[in-house]
Amino acid sequence: MKSSSRLVQAIIALLSGLFAIFINPGLVDKTVNMFLMGMTKKGTAPMGAVPAVRLFVSFTWRGVEVFAGIALLLAAYGFIKSKKWAFPLALVSLATMPIGSFYTSSFAGYMVRKHAYAPSFTAFIVGLVAFWLLIILEKRGKEMWAMMVPLTLLGMIGTQAFAFSEHGLRGIFQNGGFQAGLTASIKDPSVGVLRYSGPLMAMVLVTLFVAIYHIAAKKESGWWLGMLAGLGMAIAAIPVHFARPKASFSLAGSNAFAAGQAVKGAGTPSIFTSVYFLAGALGILLVIVLLIPFFKNQLTTEE
């Protein structure tokens, strides 16, 4: 690869890393605090279990993104020195931003309810654009598309796996609080299904990050891990659609969200509008893509 391309990759990694370390934390704070103020009567009421889950998950992931930013600084040095590990390290680090910021920017339908831009969504844009640019600079022709498509699908699945793993806890606590929600999960299948899907979603999330690294490193294991992530998403998400058909899970409910706190007029989600069913379908799509000979041959040939 030309030294000029390596230099551009290094600059992208450096700037993205500095953004993740010094700028994004403030954007996450601003976005999450706006939501929490509404859930605690402008900071005067005790915080319940549901917003507490939002808080802890958001700020834990903010720490992950800062740590990924540090890794990006190391990757920038690696690009300059033409180290093979720089590219996979940079990609998996960049993936943390769109996956995490999609969650912090969209919970409670903030951008839909308020018709306003969530500050933390900036990290989604920065991370995704940098992610794609590094792939374009690293690969050419067939190799580029063979990597771009499955890695993008893995990132899309990651946004869902992140949100749904958190919902595995929050959805339980929404049924009367911490203790009452746990009790409800014993008898109510629509609550109990979250005890099934939540842990699986967390495992899918971890797996897809490892898959991104291995695919970027041209390891055959990346293909297998991608298959595992896709199948895991389908098996975890689709049952929730049938056991927990809530209007708030319907893409058709976006206009209903904007009217106020309650979701009205959205109706029961169908397989075409259910976020859970569509997430499962996305997992199946990834598996189909990986099984196509063009992608399979490219991704199972190690360098």
What are the functions of these language-model segments?
Residues 1-303:
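Topology signature of small-to-medium multi-pass alpha-helical membrane proteins
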